[in-house]
């Protein structure tokens, strides 16, 4: 998740980016973006890399025009390349939302590295809150004898926290890709679509529909 342009300018909105790539050589195979402004520009860049048989490493090297009202200093395309490169190089062990759903909580430690205020607004069940800024001072609270699963809002702080733990001797540390934002988007049930079969019907027909629905509600 990256901003469509510099965050200190009005109306900066996050875009969610998904890419597929070969684990063997990093060849970029596909890309998908959900967002608002700037989506078309970024998907064009991905398509050009795919057209020329490029890799995720090429995403890091792309040169984009930059102006704060229209883009970020670290462009979302480049950030996507950084994340994929870290996975391929073994600098980060990714945790995908499907894995989290089936995890055996007796065998892992789930750590929320967001701030206490963010944690209070909602967190994953079973998570302990150790903010990134406190990680070095409080890492002794995290057991070393089982895997550690980290998450934050969108993935960046989880990545930084995983580096701290790995540098201090922890062996199996995974970071939730896309953070809590992606997890909620992927696991929250979609609302049932409304029925529009009577759209455009006459006023008399609409009246009949309204009465029948009212009767049904009353009976229930």
Could you say what each language-model-derived stretch is?
Residues 1-2, 114-116:
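Histidine- and/or cysteine-centered catalytic micro-motif in compact active-site loops
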Residues 3-7, 32-40, 67-69:
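Glycine-rich phosphate/pyrophosphate-binding beta-alpha loops
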Residues 54-109, 116-149, 153-220:
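Rhodanese-like catalytic fold shared by cysteine-dependent sulfurtransferases
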Residues 27-28:
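Hydrophobic "anchor" residues
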Residues 1-24:
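Structured beta-strand/loop patches that form or line metal/cofactor-binding pockets in enzymes
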Residues 37-56:
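A short, polar/charged loop-to-alpha-helix boundary motif
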């Amino acid at each position: 998740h990256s901003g469509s342009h510099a965050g200190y300018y009005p109306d900066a909105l996050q875009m969610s980016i998904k890419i597929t790539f070969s684990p063997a050589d990093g060849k970029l195979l596909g890309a998908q973006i959900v967002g608002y402004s700037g989506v078309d520009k970024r998907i064009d860049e991905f398509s050009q890399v795919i057209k020329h048989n490029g890799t995720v490493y090429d995403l890091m090297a792309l040169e984009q025009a930059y102006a704060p009202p229209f883009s970020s200093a670290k462009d979302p395309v480049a950030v996507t390349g950084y994340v994929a490169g870290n996975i391929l190089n073994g600098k980060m062990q990714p945790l995908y939302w499907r894995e989290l759903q089936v995890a055996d909580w007796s065998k892992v430690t789930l750590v929320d590295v967001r701030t206490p205020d963010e944690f209070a607004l909602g967190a994953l069940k079973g998570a302990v809150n150790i903010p990134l800024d406190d990680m070095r001072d409080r890492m002794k609270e995290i057991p070393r004898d089982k895997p550690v699963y980290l998450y934050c809002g969108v993935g960046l702080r989880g990545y930084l926290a995983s580096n701290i733990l790995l540098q201090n001797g922890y062996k199996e540390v995974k970071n939730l890709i896309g953070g809590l934002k992606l997890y909620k988007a992927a696991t929250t049930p979609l609302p049932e679509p409304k029925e529009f079969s009577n759209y455009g019907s006459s006023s008399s027909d609409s009246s009949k529909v309204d009465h029948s629905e009212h009767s049904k509600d009353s009976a229930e």
